[in-house]
Amino acid sequence: LTDAIIGQMMEGITLPDFADIDIDKFDYTYKELKDGEDGIQRGGYPGQGFPAYAAHMGAKYKAMKEAEQRWENIEVLDADVVCVAYGISSRVCKEAVRKARAKGIKLGLIRLITAWPFPEKAFAEINPDCKGLLAVEMSIKGQMVPDIKLATKCNMPVYGYFSLDVVPDADVVVETAEKIIAGTCEEV
C-alpha cells in the first residue's frame, strides 16, 4: 500500500528475486479462458442462480480475507501507544518509533501493506496494556479510523494525526503519543 510521495521517491531499492506463483492454488484468482470463451457472463447467474452465486462470492471473499492480510508490526508487543500507518506516513512513524524509544517512550507501529483485506490480525499482537492507537495518515478525517475501530472491536481508544497537504512530522507523532500516555489527547 503506497501513496504518491512513495511513488515519486528516487532512492535505491533492493527487490526480492523473481518467483513464479501458482495462481491456480487459490480458488479466488483469475482463471484462464478456454478456446472460444470471451469471459462475459450472459443470461443471469450460472447454475443455481443468484443464491448460489452469492454464496460462492461470500466464500471467495472470506478466503481472500483470511489469506491476503498483509502488514508489518514494529515494537508493538510492549508499546504504550501504537501508530497505524501506510505509505509515506509509515516511514515517518518508523522514525517516530526510533526517536520515542530513544527517549524511553514505548511507541510501536502497525504498517499496513494491504488496505483490503484490512489486516485485522495485526492488532492481536498489541500489548493489552496499550493506552491507544494513533492513526497517522495524509487525509482530512482519517479514512482508516473506522477500520481500526472494527479491527479492535472498539476495545481500544483511537486517536488521530491527519495532515492533508504536508508529510506528517515524526516529532509531532512522538508529541501526540506523549499526550495519549498523559491522557490529554482527544479520541477521534
Where are these regions (language model features)?
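Peripheral docking tails and interdomain loops at the edges
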Residues: E137-V188
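Conformationally flexible catalytic loops at phosphate/diphosphate-handling active centers
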Residues: L1-N73
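Short acidic, glycine/serine/threonine-rich loops at helix termini
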Residues: G7-L15, E95, A122, V145-I148, ...
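Redox- and metal-dependent alpha/beta enzyme cores, enriched for Fe-S-associated oxidoreductases
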Residues: R70-K106, I110, W116-A122
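Gly/Ser/Thr-rich loops at beta-strand to alpha-helix junctions
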Residues: I5-I6, Y86-V92, W116, S139-Q143, ...
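Structural signature of the thiamine diphosphate
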Residues: L1-I21, G132, M138, E175-V188
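Short, solvent-exposed amphipathic alpha-helical segments in soluble enzyme
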Residues: T14-F18, E95-K106, A124-P128, K149-C154
